[in-house]
């Protein structure tokens, strides 16, 4: 109990003050503007926002001027309500939408400051060099490759959402004590429900993983996930030497429910303490591994199917009692690893069984020894990626390439750069696939879509256009992967890259999931 209280007090001692004045600093909005222009890997900001770089800088300066005006947020919300429901002027709606996006990005940048400082100080205390490599998404897969081959069952978990926005704000109160900033953030979330970039239901619950989601909501959602993972990890680590009565101390964080009546808090604590006493006895599995990214998590175990069902029951009750989030049973699937493929981080992952027989000779007798080896395998989900390309209007649902009419107003070099950028990102992200044939099919769709787009711009056919410019125009769509491999591994033999389509390579510079994967 004292250990947990000391840990919580240590966290509270790092709470940050005086974030509110940063909302009136011009460089914050400049950072938000720069993030809006360069934050996407797949979609271009010109398409999303509808303005060029020069005019957007003017809009940012205009926004900074309006921030100093009294009741700016209220007038912004009122303008948005009139524009959306009465019949709006396009320019006014565009300005309101742009200003709202900039304010949302600015809130995200400000609230990330204390957490970024805490992360840097943590790695400095632990003396961990090159900690940026630990941020790579690909670093998860070698961990899975090493651990899952020894486990039996896996639970595929969809973390429940939407979450009530008041709970999200109250979670931040554990880390930030700047009351004006928190009140302004609460007002911003409540009043900003009618714009497309913030999808909030009438009950003011946030759907975090929508296509229109922005940086602020992802940060708030990650804070919510960190809160319950903090308790989950502590329970997992401390079961061996803490008595069951100590688990009631988790509920001493009643500042999370400061505005609830005292009687309700008391009943809540009693119910949850009884719940912990009933369920924590089964947390004695030394081979339990947990991996999460975005709204999905994997819980793998060497235990039995009954143990996994108990963990499932534990998650449901924990979300319900602690966060008031109701979760449906279909959000957690329990499967045996030997005959199950799960979709995670843009890959279809499975555990392959390899059977082999070895003949053993002992004196005059010989016999066969059958052995089974397990191998963690990852492949490109071609069907999912084709569906993503179809949503982005690069092909039909059956995978037939089509032109991109919205890009025909761009120059030829810009069109080639955009298609080439998408192909390079896909090759880079899916470099860990054991079978590259599916990735080559995706690149072929993008290559032909690029050719159709250029041919449509020049009012020609694809065959005529390629005959006139030559096939070398689109070679980068297929040679980029070998160039990357040649830079990483010096080509000592002429046959080094001959089998590169079978090599799996995990990079340490991929810090976010590919946007095409997010659409699938």
From Swiss-Prot:
One of its GO terms (molecular function) is RNA binding. The keyword Plastid applies. Keywords: Chloroplast, mRNA processing, Plastid, RNA-binding, tRNA processing. Disulfide bonds: none annotated. It holds the Pfam family MatK_N. GO terms for cellular component: chloroplast. GO terms for biological process: mRNA processing; RNA splicing; tRNA processing. The keyword RNA-binding applies. It is found in: Plastid, Chloroplast. It comes from the Eukaryota. Usually encoded in the trnK tRNA gene intron. Probably assists in splicing its own and other chloroplast group II introns. HAMAP family: MatK. PANTHER family: MATURASE K (PTHR34811:SF1). Belongs to the intron maturase 2 family. MatK subfamily. This is Maturase K. The gene is matK.
């Amino acid at each position: 109990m004292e250990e947990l209280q000391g840990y919580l007090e240590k966290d509270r001692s790092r709470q940050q003050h005086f974030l509110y004045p940063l909302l009136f600093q011009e460089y914050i909005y400049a950072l938000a503007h720069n993030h809006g222009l360069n934050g996407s890997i797949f979609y271009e900001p010109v398409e999303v926002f509808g303005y060029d770089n020069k005019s957007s800088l003017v809009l940012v300066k205009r926004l900074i001027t309006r921030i100093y005006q009294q009741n700016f947020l209220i007038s912004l919300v009122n303008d948005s309500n009139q524009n959306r429901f009465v019949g709006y002027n396009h320019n006014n709606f565009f300005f309101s939408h742009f200003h709202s996006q900039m304010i949302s990005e600015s809130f995200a940048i400000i609230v990330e400051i204390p957490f970024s400082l805490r992360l840097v100080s943590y790695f400095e205390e632990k003396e961990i060099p090159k900690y940026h490599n630990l941020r790579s998404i690909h670093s998860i897969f070698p961990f899975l490759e090493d651990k899952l081959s020894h486990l039996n069952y896996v639970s595929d978990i969809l973390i429940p959402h939407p979450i009530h926005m008041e709970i999200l704000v109250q979670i931040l109160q554990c880390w930030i004590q700047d009351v004006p900033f928190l009140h302004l953030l609460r007002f911003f979330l409540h009043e900003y429900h009618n714009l497309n970039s913030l999808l909030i239901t009438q009950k003011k619950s946030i759907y975090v993983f929508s296509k229109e989601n922005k940086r602020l909501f992802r940060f708030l959602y990650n804070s919510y996930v960190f809160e319950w993972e903090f308790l989950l990890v502590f329970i997992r680590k401390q079961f061996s030497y803490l008595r069951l009565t100590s688990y009631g101390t988790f509920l001493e964080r009643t500042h999370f429910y400061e505005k609830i009546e005292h009687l309700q808090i008391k009943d809540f604590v009693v119910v949850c303490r009884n719940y912990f006493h009933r369920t924590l006895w089964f947390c004695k599995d030394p081979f339990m591994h947990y991996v999460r990214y975005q709204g999905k998590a994997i819980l793998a175990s060497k235990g039995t199917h009954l143990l996994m069902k108990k963990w499932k029951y534990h998650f449901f009750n924990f979300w319900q009692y602690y966060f008031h989030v109701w979760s449906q049973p279909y959000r957690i699937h329990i499967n045996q690893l030997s005959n199950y493929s799960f979709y995670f981080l843009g890959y279809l992952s499975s555990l392959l069984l390899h059977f082999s027989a070895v003949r053993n000779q002992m004196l005059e007798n010989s016999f066969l020894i059958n052995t089974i080896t397990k191998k963690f395998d990852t492949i490109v989900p071609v069907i999912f990626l084709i569906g993503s390309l179809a949503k982005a209007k690069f092909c039909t649902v059956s995978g037939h390439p089509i032109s991109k009419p919205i890009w025909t107003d761009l120059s030829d070099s810009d069109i080639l750069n955009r298609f080439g950028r998408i192909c390079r990102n896909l090759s880079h992200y899916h470099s860990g696939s054991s079978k590259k044939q599916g990735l080559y099919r995706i690149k072929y769709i993008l290559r032909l879509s690029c050719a159709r787009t250029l041919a449509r711009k020049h009012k020609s056919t694809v065959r005529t256009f390629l005959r006139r410019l030559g096939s070398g125009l689109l070679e980068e769509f297929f040679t980029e992967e070998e160039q990357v491999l040649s830079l990483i591994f010096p080509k000592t033999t002429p046959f080094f890259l001959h089998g590169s389509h079978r090599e799996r390579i995990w990079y340490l510079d991929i810090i976010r999931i590919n946007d095409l994967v997010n659409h699938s």
